[in-house]
Amino acid sequence: RAGISVIACAQGASETNISFVIKHKYLRKALNSIHDSFFLSEYKVLNLFVVGIGTVGGNLLEQIRLQQPKLMEQNGLKLNIVGIANSRKALICRDGINLDNYREELETNGMDSTPETLCEQVLKMNIFNSVFVDCTASPDVAALYARLMNGNVSVVAANKEAASSSYENYQLLKETARHRGIKFLFETNVGAGL
């Protein structure tokens, strides 16, 4: 479910424990996945990376800010904004970004960023239940989808570039999402031209 390959697995002689070996870089993600599955946390966490903070992205972040308490209370869903980026800078924080002042934080504490370096940061964080939300119109950002999805990051795209590119690319993205057990959502593309 989390896209982590198990190198070796063994059951103890008393049949009360299971041990498995994974690559060290997947340790945190594996622990979060196991805890989420076995101990049924009080709420589900979605870790969002939002790219593009213009009209669409800015309004999305404002809606999330206003709805976070209600989503937690009524749906048991915690939307944790772990990354925000514009065309020049990115702000990344595993523990979550305060949406009350994210624009100022991005300008003062954000690191210089390109679509490629942002993709590397997202994959390097290796967080369970990650969702990359593309609110740009950039073909360079859309070109990252396959790589992100191969890293088990779901993609939600208001950007019409990927879904309206070649049919082969569209099929690749849909197949990658299906194979990886993640989401590729792009319904907002339909309204982009209206």
Per-range role (PLM):
Residues 10-12, 40-43, 74-77, 124-126, ...:
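Solvent-exposed alpha-helices and their adjacent loops that cap or buttress functional pockets
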Residues 3-4, 26, 35-42, 60, ...:
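Structural signal for hydrophobic packing residues in well-ordered secondary-structure cores
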Residues 47-53, 57-150:
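N-terminal glycine-/serine-/threonine-rich beta1-alpha1-beta2 phosphate-ribose binding loop
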Residues 136-151, 160-193:
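Rossmann-fold NAD(P)-binding glycine/threonine-rich loop
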Residues 1-62:
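A conserved regulatory-domain signal marking ACT and ACT-like small-molecule sensing domains
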Residues 11-15, 25, 53, 87-89, ...:
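Short, ordered loop/turn segments at secondary-structure junctions
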